[in-house]
UniProtKB/Swiss-Prot annotation:
One of its GO terms (biological process) is translation. This is Large ribosomal subunit protein bL21. It holds the Pfam family Ribosomal_L21p. HAMAP family: Ribosomal_bL21. InterPro entries: bL21-like (IPR028909), bL21-like_sf (IPR036164), Ribosomal_bL21 (IPR001787), Ribosomal_bL21_CS (IPR018258). This protein binds to 23S rRNA in the presence of protein L20. One of its GO terms (molecular function) is rRNA binding. Belongs to the bacterial ribosomal protein bL21 family. It comes from Prosthecochloris vibrioformis. GO terms for cellular component: cytoplasm; ribonucleoprotein complex; ribosome. The gene is rplU. Part of the 50S ribosomal subunit. Contacts protein L20. It comes from the Bacteria.
Length: 95
């Protein structure tokens, strides 16, 4: 059974045992967090029914580098910056 959960105003379609990366959370590794479950998919009535899901924080990591390149033509102006977003890896324990 799958569920649509919401963490930090972002929605994820998950099932039990999935490991996903979410925006950084204020929790230490090993903590269990309850998050809002918007809908359970795979039941006879897949209507919007709010509930809770439990996720376990595994690790805090940084995402891949995203290159931000700016240029102004004919002016010899170029800027190249990199950005790495802080992410939290969580595992869905129960829906």
């Amino acid at each position: 059974m799958q569920a649509l959960i919401e963490i930090s105003d972002k929605q994820f379609l998950v099932q039990e045992g999935d490991k996903i990366f979410v925006p950084k959370q204020k929790a230490v590794a090993g903590d269990v967090i309850e998050v809002k479950s918007l809908m359970k998919v795979g039941q006879a009535d897949s209507a919007l029914s709010e509930g809770t899901a439990k996720v376990k924080v595994l690790d805090h990591v940084r995402d891949e580098t995203i290159i931000v390149f700016r240029k102004k033509r004919r002016k010899r102006f170029q800027r190249r910056n990199g950005h790495r977003q802080h992410m939290t890896q969580v595992e869905v324990m129960s829906i």
